[in-house]
Amino acid sequence: MRTHLLSITALALTAFGAVPAAAQVNGVGVTDPAIAIAGSQALQAAYTQIGTTYQAQRTQLEQLQGQRDALLRQFDTDGDGQMNEAEQQAAQANATVIQQMQALDQTIQQTQAPIQLARIYAIEQIAMQYGNAVQQVVAANNVSLILSPGSVVYAADAVDLTDEIIARLNTLVPTVSASAPAGWQPQRQSVTLFQEVQQLLLSAAVQQQQQQAAPAQAPVQGR
């Protein structure tokens, strides 16, 4: 998990097509709240603690997902590991399988709930300081405009502010609680941020797997 989190800022530089803030400052910056929050030390520590606290639930989730995958494999007639339209229709026509999958999905959702709530709570605490971190970076770099990745079509001179914002977050909120209070309900923006962070983690994990697999797939030379 820590490796995935640390890979996120590298992904950000590629996605933005921007240079680090230390390289130049021209008044235009680019950053993304989810990437900055995901790269903060507080979230890395919180995710690690949450993973330890809910290790039993994570193990149960792996088992439940394995049971669900086994049900679907019954209908994977071509053995490609994917469910095409015909195979999906065959599975949906089997009432017993549908009932079993619905029961598994409900159990998976219930098991995931406390883990997700703890992660969202950690993210929300950091997000509360994100605005302050941005303001400090803006003042330090004389930035007049900050763009999000989704709003950038082309910006040759854009400055990536992500690393500086992460550094400010590390100072403003070095640690957060990884346990949500009883009855706590997250803000809608926090749920959205959580979903974005999870997608970033998935992308970082996929990229890491591809990089690790690349040497093994490289052709043998000199023979």
Where are these regions (language model features)?
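Bacterial N-terminal signal peptides that target proteins for export
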Residues: 1-8
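Hydrophobic alpha-helical membrane context
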Residues: 15-16, 44
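Hydrophobic helical h-region of N-terminal Sec-dependent signal peptides
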Residues: 9-13
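N-terminal signal peptide c-region/cleavage motif recognized by signal peptidases
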Residues: 18-20
